[in-house]
Amino acid sequence: MPIGVPKVPFRLPGEPSAQWVDLYNRLYRERVLFLCQDLDDELANQLIGIMLYLNAEEKSKDLYIYINSPGGSVTCGIAVYDTMNYIKADVTTICVGTAASMASFVLAGGTQGKRIALPHSRIMIHQPEGGSRGQASEVLSESEEVMRIRRQVGKIYAQRTGQPLRRISRDLDRDQFLSAREAKDYGIVDQVATS
């Protein structure tokens, strides 16, 4: 039987007593967000909305995004990345399990010096996928768009990791799995957390 989302006590500033709120709402108040499932439109919009709200509330305090995700939509990942870089608050990204595909892109998109992987994390990069059906002109158009996005993603990875674009392009050709230490050496994260 599922237990649901746990409730925890939380006292709002100026309130005499605590209220019971769900764990995630409590953590949002501490500027902690989660990317722990497939990155789809709904999750991307939630993350973007929360980041914009928390940034408007306090621009000088860091946001923390904990990542354990197989990835998801390329356009959603780019939207989250763009928002992370649009807001004034620094964004610390932390891989707590797996950051694959667009989740690794979000991980790499954290503020330089504040991208962390736990010691047994796995990070995977690969090229964006696309699939189309229909008339030849539609398939060609979709293919051109996928290649444009691939170039865009490759340039961003190169910028964020310090790796040459030629190497990034080669590495994106197939799934590249990295340990936390390898991800640090590659430049996707800045540090491997220790206890």
Swiss-Prot record:
It is found in: Plastid, Chloroplast stroma. It is an enzyme of class 3 (hydrolase). It comes from the Eukaryota. Its EC number is 3.4.21.92. GO terms for molecular function: ATP-dependent peptidase activity; ATPase binding; serine-type endopeptidase activity. One of its GO terms (cellular component) is chloroplast stroma. PROSITE patterns: CLP_PROTEASE_HIS, CLP_PROTEASE_SER. One of its GO terms (biological process) is protein quality control for misfolded or incompletely synthesized proteins. The active site is at 101 (nucleophile), 126. Component of the chloroplastic Clp protease core complex. Belongs to the peptidase S14 family. This is ATP-dependent Clp protease proteolytic subunit.
